[in-house]
């Protein structure tokens, strides 16, 4: 199995980061198989969504509505509302699997692979790409 870790600097901002180009580069020339995208973090997830039409902010706003950033959480270290970040992986999985055909991601027309990072306390993130040949 081919595998690679990609390091991302997210700074002190929360948000959605498009990693589709990095994923496409990783599988280029690999033939048919499956790409697993994994975020080894307790407060980040991987999603396949449309980007560039406001969906990124819609996702963050929806997560903020579902998981308010206040002091209701028992997990209280870090910035205010950080406990919400630790609930995120139950809603946005830390991994996604994308089919690959002839070395290309078989995503839909508007689909992109993104890192969902609501946690501004961690300025650096890792994403692991793993390719399993078919």
Where are these predicted regions, by residue range?
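Active-site histidine-anchored catalytic micro-motif
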Residues: 1-134
């Amino acid at each position: 199995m081919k595998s690679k870790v990609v390091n991302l600097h997210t700074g002190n901002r929360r948000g959605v980061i498009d990693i589709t180009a990095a994923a496409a580069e990783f599988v280029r020339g690999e033939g048919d198989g499956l790409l697993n995208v994994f975020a080894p973090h307790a407060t980040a997830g991987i999603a396949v969504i449309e980007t560039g039409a406001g969906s990124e902010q819609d996702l963050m706003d929806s997560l903020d509505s579902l998981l308010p950033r206040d002091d209701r959480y028992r997990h209280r270290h870090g910035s205010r509302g950080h406990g919400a970040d630790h609930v995120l992986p139950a809603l946005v999985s830390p991994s996604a699997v994308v089919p690959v055909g002839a070395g290309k991601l078989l995503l839909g027309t508007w689909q992109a692979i993104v890192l969902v990072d609501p946690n501004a306390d961690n300025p650096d993130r890792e994403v692991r790409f793993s390719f399993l040949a078919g």
